[in-house]
């Protein structure tokens, strides 16, 4: 297959697939496929509900077409799969979306085709889990009739600076020739350059440790924040002082959620356990980060008690629900842990987040965010997500939402140290 002969399809048009499809659509013909008809209809009308891409950006992708029809995939010969890889209720990898996408592609596979995976997985998943599905439903043989590549996504939702094209891309292939083809394909759109890995397993491992390393580093800072808070020392001041040394890593405490950093370590841990090794640090980091919602709720209740604010039936406003700032994604947000804990104390909790897509919080968590918080109504306010709207409000506007003796708990350093009552 020559470069000019590639007929490209992107499978899954979410936070990863859509920006990728748009970039390729500026260079070559691309078919964007998603099983969600509502999503395809919105994109055809120039609207991206994730707000990652504007209508103008979508319109500049002249060669991109959208479909939900699997028959359209038969006209393609190179498929990039970008579906989610979540975990189940027991924190075990859930490969079902990936395997179903593989089955869909397999039914369209022809001799000479290439299937590239971008979804984050544990090392070995592409060749050990996905390839058998491709072989079974296509009737073709791996590395004889069809070939595979792996190029892990590095999307950073809500970040308008680091985009698909200016983030260096890891590439790999199931044969040396396939690896070169995959690398050349991505070079069409990646201005930051590519890194051709030695194997698919190397590329898979590289991706999963990127997020595992970040998770562990945040866990360390979260633990330090708990210790420093007990000593009455401001964590941000300590981090700023330590950061004056050139090799100190600039991590901040906080809730760790979303579909990457809070999930991927479990994939690596799962594989480690499958080969007979119990990972200590990886799972310890996960436990600590998952406990932060309970910690925040407990600290707030203690502060309210000290101020003689009656906890039961207290009205509490949580500002922000998405897993990170300036992003619509509520999947695996750990803000819900705070909501759950406070409701255990019979607090009346309102959640306010202008970024949340209507109906999604109710669908995932049974939470209905309020449209606008009422001034002077709350006994406590938690600034949980650093949306630009919240930063621009300033301390007076935020405090005016509370009663006279209300407590402001700033989890994200949106306010100065002296402007809040509690911080991480």
What is the role of each PLM region?
Residues 1-424:
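Structural/interface elements that position substrates and couple domains in central-metabolism enzymes
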